[in-house]
Amino acid sequence: MTDAPFDRADIDALLDARHPDPFACLGPHRVGDATVVRTLLPGALRVRAIAAGGGVLGELRQVDPAGCFAGALPDGRERGERPRYRLSIDWPDARQDVEDAYAFGTLLDEDALARFAAGDPRAALACLGARALDMDGVPGVRFAVWAPGASRVSVVGDFNGWDARRHPMRLRRPWGVWELFVPRIGAGERYKFALRARDGAALPLKADPCACRTEAPPRTASIVADLDALERFGWHDDAWLRARASLDLAHAPVSIYEVHPESWLRVAAEGNRSATWDELAQRLIPYAAGMGFSHVELTPIAEYPFGGSWGYQSLSPFAPSARFGPPEGFARFVEHAHAAGLGVIVDWVPAHFPDDPHGLGKFDGTALFEHADPREGWHPDWHTHVFNVGRREVGAFLIASALAWAHRYHVDGIRVDAVASMLYRDYSRAAGEWVPNVYGGRENLESIAFLKHFNDTLHGPAAPPGVATFAEESTAWPGVTAPTAEHGLGFDFKWNMGWMHDTLAYLREDPIHRRHHHDRLTFGLVYAFSERFVLPLSHDEVVHGKGSLAAKMPGDAWQRLANLRAYFGFMWAHPGKKLLFMGGEFAQWGEFAHDATPQWDLLDAPAHRGVQRLVRDLNRLHAAEPALHALDDRPAGFAWLVGDDRNNSVFAFVRRDDAGRMLVAVCNFTPVPRTDYRLGLPAPGRWAEVLNTDGAAYGGTDAGNGGALQADEIPAHGERWSAALRLPPLATLWLRPA
């Protein structure tokens, strides 16, 4: 080999890890009639260029003792052809033969990059992150990261000793995306990005925002995921997916078991660690299916650094948390769920993200993912950054993560957290602490557009058919579940937070005072059909001093459980889909604690087993009775029979389906049994008592009507027929024409 020039300024910039364009000097370059190869390999003793067969093409001379080598290849190729060579590197303890990362051309398609910049989530999914693949027949990993404000980005990891000088990346300047193909590494490699801000200042090492796998906290590196293995995963849920695509979920029975997977099951013999996905598949799935739930909903499982956030402060929205094992484990979990007849819903948090130094905040030295103005970009309640969803690339990044959960893991639903905080610019902000929109209003127009884009994408051809979207939205914002074509947000369902707050406030009252709060239980029907609702008894209501569901109830232990059973009977008969957080199904006394399991030992007590049995029976009856779900979102599916008996705290209503089938629910929310309570009924003859929450099997007194009653032609409550009922104390009855 002949000598080859290596500019001193380039050498200094490379050694300082501040060169803005490493491909301009590293790798093969045509200089006159020769091909010059330059490489930066700090710590290398000797470097030679070798042919594919192993023959030595020549020596690269060390031009700087810090690790800069250069030399000219013998000219034996056509002009314009990429030179074929490998580097044979002598390290102090080993020899390595590897392709030159700087001998490869551009990696990402310009059209895909342009679509990403325009806000296309499919392009974000295709372009960004780490992908093990072959380039020109060479195996390796393609890295790509969006960081338009950085002056230099390197990928670092175990494969280069975490040395930012070794693998500086190429900037695709119009789009702000940095890329590099690193040969001869693969899935399982740990890595991060080393960035310099525009002023040259070194930033903390950053995890990959689009990493599909991470280290388990408290470690923070990204890991190259085996996406090929995920894409080749042996799914056997084709029948489930076909049925899901044709299912009208709004008019189907939906009962959701909300689970914090980190604490639902812990392994005490191994330091109280969380269960793996495979362990949860063996325990949680048969339990939830056996309880009659239609879905499990998981609090956020995208990797999150702080366990005390319960997952709601995620930094890696594409990566299932390593707390539970590798990504393939989550795929197996979903596969098991579908085989058992359970859908899987995941919580998703596009509103905000935490301030951890390895995360998204000031990612490239600028406010990249967040707003620059703290009045828009900092959340005062949670002390987190607010995503700038109005920036096209940020919106594409977030929606791409939702698509990834749907495509890679076959999830059946995505529940969007904290929607209200996104919709209002003054959410939790005092006057002067927020920025009005362009019209001077408080509505966040960018978030509205983002949420519509999210729903249109998840309901469009880019996503698998039948994926449902849920909004945790706590205000009276109109049209949350209206189609985007009708100026709605486009969600399938909205959590009915108002119903939850009102009904729990009623149940907290001593029964003697409930007559003064009667409207709290009836008010929900004023707006019950304005949206498609989920009735949520979620984790948020059993934490931070609010008390568990059972602990909220007044009275002694028996009365508390009786109140809760009656409430469950009322809730499962009420219009709206059902959601119950873990522990509530057996009336645990303690609040949710993220570092402890539910109080499973309470199931040794018959009273708590009785509540559990009731929830199971409610789920099964709810699924079997079309009147209880077929018209959940339509006024024709509900009518009050007794809505004004505040003196007795008695409520009664009828549920119907569009075929005329009906079921009547009657609730007595006092501890006083009511004998000969005449109730108007919509049909004559024999009525079966299909459910009594005071049944002995549920821990009650077994008072009731002996399983049946007769409706005679005696007018009452606006109906032609009526029956004299015995109403058990603190109980709900379900009646159906026999």
From Swiss-Prot:
Query: What is this enzyme's catalytic activity, as reactions?
Result: Transfers a segment of a (1->4)-alpha-D-glucan chain to a primary hydroxy group in a similar glucan chain
Provide the GO biological process annotations.
Answer: glycogen biosynthetic process
Q: Which Gene3D superfamilies match?
A: Glycosidases, Golgi alpha-mannosidase II, Immunoglobulins
Please name the catalytic residues of this protein: D417, E472
Which SMART domains does the entry link to? Aamy (SM00642)
Entry superkingdom: Bacteria
Q: Name a single GO cellular component.
A: cytosol
GO MF annotation terms: 1,4-alpha-glucan branching enzyme activity; cation binding; hydrolase activity, hydrolyzing O-glycosyl compounds
The pathway where this protein functions is:
Glycan biosynthesis; glycogen biosynthesis
Keywords in alphabetical order, please: Carbohydrate metabolism, Glycogen biosynthesis, Glycogen metabolism, Glycosyltransferase, Transferase
InterPro entries per record: A-amylase/branching_C, Branching_enzy, GlgB, GlgB_N, GlgB_N_E_set_prok, Glyco_hydro_13_cat_dom, Glyco_hydro_13_N, Glyco_hydro_b
Subunit (UniProt):
Monomer.
Family listed: Belongs to the glycosyl hydrolase 13 family. GlgB subfamily.
Q: What is the name attached to this protein's record?
A: 1,4-alpha-glucan branching enzyme GlgB
The gene coding this protein: glgB
